């Protein structure tokens, strides 16, 4: 999708991976006070809205979140969970693949 950054997140059942996408403007800059605190953004999966939760683990390159390059480094320092089919799934960092 043009103008959007996608994150491919593996479902707890590896045979059924799924992807969610969000607009860059939906993601806020990470501040030092955000480190270790959970943040939430809306994600789209198959044109349906879901909540994507992520927890910043580092202040690395804070303030550059809107630049595509930072999406790579941001999520390498991030844990995520996703509300999917009414259940909340934890997502390992290594399962997050930034698609630019």
From Swiss-Prot:
Top-level division of the source organism's lineage: Eukaryota
One record GO biological process: positive regulation of translation
Assembly and interaction partners: May interact with ribosomes.
Protein name, as recorded: Uncharacterized protein YPR096C
Species, as recorded: Saccharomyces cerevisiae (strain ATCC 204508 / S288c) (Baker's yeast)
Lineage: Eukaryota, Fungi, Dikarya, Ascomycota, Saccharomycotina
């Amino acid at each position: 999708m043009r103008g959007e950054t996608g994150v491919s997140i593996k479902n707890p059942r590896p045979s059924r991976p799924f992807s969610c996408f969000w607009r860059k403007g939906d993601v806020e800059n990470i501040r030092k006070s955000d480190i270790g605190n959970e943040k939430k953004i809306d994600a789209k999966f198959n044109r349906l809205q879901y909540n994507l939760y992520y927890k910043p683990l580092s202040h690395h390159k804070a303030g550059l979140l809107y630049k595509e390059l930072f999406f790579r480094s941001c999520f390498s320092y991030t844990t995520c969970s996703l509300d999917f089919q009414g259940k909340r799934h934890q997502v390992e960092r290594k399962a997050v693949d930034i698609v630019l």
